Amino acid sequence: MAKGKMDEVLENFRKEIQGFISCDVVNISDGLSIGGGSIDPKFDASIAAAYYATVASAYVKTCHAIDKTMEPEDMLITTDQMLLLMRVIANNNYFFGLAVTPDSNLAMCRLIMKKYEEEIIKAI
């Protein structure tokens, strides 16, 4: 794992996201973050990573149970305080999660996440 490269890629990514709160690249099987973090001191990204890995794993299993050829892309979780967009990447082994403020532009977030996906996969 090229931790320095991952940090660089995610720092560039953060600069493009309006309403950024947190992002993480997380191993779905163990819930451990391999890069990322939060600008909000009240938001513990490591706890979120661990719990959302369970959600991402269930999402992948559900897609494949419905149709073995169905490939998961992303999922959206909303709360009164944030929007969480998670993209399943790297052969369903990792997810790239982004938390933003509720007034953020989701379409732009999705586009920017897709833009950085290959760089993130290379840095894993």
What are these model-predicted stretches?
Residues 1-124:
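Non-catalytic interaction/Regulatory regions outside core domains
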